[in-house]
Each structure stands twice: as structure tokens, then as C-alpha cells.
Design a protein with these regions (language model features):
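N-terminal subdomain of lithium-sensitive/metallo-dependent phosphomonoesterases centered on the IMPase/IPPase/PAP
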Residues: 1-33, 92-95, 126, 140-141
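Solvent-exposed alpha-helices and their adjacent loops that cap or buttress functional pockets
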Residues: 9, 21-27, 35, 44-47, ...
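Acidic beta-strand-loop-alpha-helix segment within the catalytic core
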Residues: 53, 58-134
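DPxDG-like acidic metal-binding loop motif
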Residues: 27-38, 42-61
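Short acidic, glycine/serine/threonine-rich loops at helix termini
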Residues: 14-17, 44-47, 65-68, 121-125, ...
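Short, ordered loop/turn segments at secondary-structure junctions
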Residues: 8, 59, 115, 138-140, ...
Length: 173
């Protein structure tokens, strides 16, 4: 398999970099997206919540992007693909979600990393009277909250790591 998105270059790590070949070379050709330590701050502070995550797909099926931050928006499978878009305003996406699910804005919960880069999004969500669930770290686990109603998270949005975004997209697909 070949790493198409990973952590090596961004974190100055010697392994799991884009283009790295893994395996014995005699199996099927696959693409790999990997985040060896999701929740690095949890590990550094000896807290629970970190995990290792990866996505594997047929060659050419995973986004091959530079190791960088990316804008993200995730919802459960009850929202038709393409209905919401990172290029739409926060308000437009919330309105679309509200229309699709017949939920009042005050009943919608958005999960987002508590980062200064998200201050405008958080302010906009509060202005719209949307519930905001702030998390300190772990945008993979935060985004996956939308996949099960027991967590009461409707939307995950914000800016986070590229590998995590590709992995979450594969998991939710």
C-alpha cells in the first residue's frame, strides 16, 4: 500500500509520509490515510481519548492531499450528500440542516474544536441559537459523534488536520 495522506511531513516524523510504500509489495494496490496519534495532547497530558486511526481503500479512492489543515463539515447519514457544503456560510448550512431534519435551530448541536481559529464560527453558532459542544482535542472522535444519535451531535464543523478529515470522510461514507 501507499500512504496518500499521513502525518510524517507535517509533524517532521520519519515515517508515514505521503508516498511511503508499506507492506511486502505483493498484495493488492491500496491507498492509506493514517493518523498514528489522534489526540496528541491527550497523550502528552496522560489523559484518555487518544487513538490511532487509518483508512484503507482501493488505489485512487482516497484524497491525495498535502499534509495541511482543511475545512470540515460532517453530518450523519440522514443528511443527503451534497446538501451542506464547507463553501456555504455557517448560517446557510444550519438552515439547510434545520430544513432537512425539521429541527429548530435551538435543538441543533454542533461539535467544534475549541480553538482561536474557530472563534467566528462559534460566535455565529451562538448568534443562531445553536447548541455548541466544544471539545479540546480529537477531531476524528468529535466528527464521528454525528454517526450515532446517542451522542446528540448533529453537525461537526471547523478546521483541522487533513489526515483526520480524510479518515473521517472514509468512516462516515
Amino acid at each position: 500500500g501507499k500512504v496518500v495522506i499521513g502525518e510524517g511531513e507535517l509533524d517532521e516524523a520519519p515515517m508515514l509520509y505521503i508516498g511511503e510504500e508499506l507492506g511486502r509489495g505483493n498484495g493488492p494496490e491500496i491507498d492509506i490515510a493514517v493518523d498514528p496519534v489522534e489526540g496528541t495532547n491527550f497523550v502528552a497530558k496522560n489523559l484518555p481519548g487518544s487513538m490511532s486511526v487509518l483508512a484503507v481503500a482501493e488505489k485512487g479512492k482516497l484524497l491525495n492531499a498535502p499534509e495541511t489543515y482543511m475545512e470540515k463539515i460532517a453530518t450523519g447519514s440522514h443528511v443527503p450528500k451534497g446538501s451542506m457544503d464547507i463553501d456555504f456560510s455557517v448560517e446557510k448550512n444550519i438552515n439547510i440542516y434545520s430544513d432537512i431534519t425539521n429541527k429548530k435551530k435551538s435543538d441543533i448541536t454542533v461539535c467544534i474544536l475549541n480553538r482561536p481559529r474557530h472563534s467566528k464560527i462559534i460566535s455565529e453558532l451562538k448568534r443562531l441559537n445553536v447548541n455548541v459542544k466544544l471539545i479540546t482535542d480529537g477531531d476524528v472522535s468529535g466528527a464521528l459523534l454525528v454517526s450515532d444519535k446517542k451522542y446528540d451531535v448533529d453537525i461537526f464543523m471547523g478546521i483541522g488536520g487533513g489526515p483526520e478529515g480524510v479518515i473521517v470522510a472514509a468512516a462516515l461514507d
